[in-house]
């Protein structure tokens, strides 16, 4: 049985751990609020961008662009968005597991795909598994600006345009709620989806100058880059939600453990006092 000192030391160390997890929970909650606000604000821009691009793409049969056209797939690119730090529950593990499962099902060899990875957790695991990483980015800011990821986004789009790969997917955790993040695969290139859905309005509302084709040449790469940035904002909100939930659970578990240890301490202390009283009474009886 543990001594009173051992139990007391465990109580004190668990209380210190609880202070840390509680602080991390509060910090993550504050970061989550800012990340949600940023993602929601950016969605307004992204929605309008989709509408404009869709209208240009549908404006006439003469408009075309390599980024809108399907081509035979010889190689596939994947952008993986993970976190730089852990303590976020299954945020990274579930994402990596699902992506690698999909890759193994789609491709017979590593020559058929390449990975662009954001986040130290994902990069380190992919290196351990000797996966074909062609570009990486670590130390992503908690509140990233477009300039923070513009280099990676631009090079990803350029690699598709140059034929390094023939299609490009983004893998990230979509924010549903602080307790729920959904692993998401989004096809980025080619941009066939801009011709579909309800995002576009009547082209009669727009007049294009100098021409639809010239505007497409300028706008499409920027639009694709904006999709990468939008996914990153979503992933950041998911990361902070997952970490806040994980730290909340850790704080609750620490509190439960402290209660259990306190009960054990009181019982052990009571037993020690009872033993001392018994010994005193026994000694007094022996002297009579």
Swiss-Prot record:
GO MF term set: ATP binding; proton-transporting ATP synthase activity, rotational mechanism
**GO BP of this protein:** proton motive force-driven plasma membrane ATP synthesis
Give the superkingdom in one word: Bacteria
Disulfide linkage: none
| Keywords per UniProt | ATP synthesis, Cell membrane, CF(1), Hydrogen ion transport, Ion transport, Membrane, Transport
Give any Pfam family that matches: ATP-synt
Q: Where in the cell is it found?
A: Cell membrane
GO CC entries: plasma membrane; proton-transporting ATP synthase complex
| Topology of the protein relative to the lipid bilayer | Peripheral membrane protein
Q: Which family does it belong to?
A: Belongs to the ATPase gamma chain family.
Q: Which HAMAP family match?
A: ATP_synth_gamma_bact
Q: Tell me, how does this one assemble?
A: F-type ATPases have 2 components, CF(1) - the catalytic core - and CF(0) - the membrane proton channel. CF(1) has five subunits: alpha(3), beta(3), gamma(1), delta(1), epsilon(1). CF(0) has three main subunits: a, b and c.
What does this gene product do?
Produces ATP from ADP in the presence of a proton gradient across the membrane. The gamma chain is believed to be important in regulating ATPase activity and the flow of protons through the CF(0) complex.
Designated name of the protein: ATP synthase gamma chain
């Amino acid at each position: 049985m543990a001594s009173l000192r051992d139990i007391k030391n465990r109580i004190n160390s668990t209380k210190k751990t609880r202070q840390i997890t509680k602080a991390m929970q509060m910090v993550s909650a504050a970061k989550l609020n800012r990340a949600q606000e940023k993602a929601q604000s950016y969605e307004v821009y992204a929605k309008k961008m989709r509408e404009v691009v869709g209208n240009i793409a549908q404006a006439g049969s003469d408009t075309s662009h390599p980024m809108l056209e399907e081509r035979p797939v010889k190689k596939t690119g994947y952008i993986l968005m993970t976190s730089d730090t852990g303590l976020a529950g299954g945020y990274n593990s579930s994402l990596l597991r699902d992506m690698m499962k999909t890759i193994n099902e789609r491709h017979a060899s590593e020559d058929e795909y390449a990975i662009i990875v954001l986040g130290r957790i994902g990069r380190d695991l992919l290196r351990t598994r000797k996966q074909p990483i062609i570009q990486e980015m670590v130390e992503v800011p908690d509140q990233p600006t477009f300039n923070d990821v513009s280099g990676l986004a631009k090079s990803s789009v350029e690699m598709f345009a140059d034929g390094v790969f023939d299609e490009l997917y983004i893998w990230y955790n979509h924010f549903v709620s602080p307790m729920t993040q959904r692993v998401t695969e989004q096809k980025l290139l080619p941009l066939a989806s801009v011709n579909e859905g309800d995002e576009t309005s009547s082209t009669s509302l727009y007049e294009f100058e100098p021409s639809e084709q010239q505007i497409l040449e300028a706008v499409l790469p920027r639009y694709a880059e904006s999709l990468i940035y939008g996914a990153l904002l979503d992933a950041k909100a998911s990361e902070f939600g997952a970490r806040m939930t994980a730290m909340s659970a850790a704080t609750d578990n620490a509190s439960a453990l402290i209660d259990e240890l306190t009960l054990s301490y009181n019982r052990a202390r009571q037993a020690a006092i009872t033993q001392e009283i018994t010994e005193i009474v026994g000694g007094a009886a022996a002297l009579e």
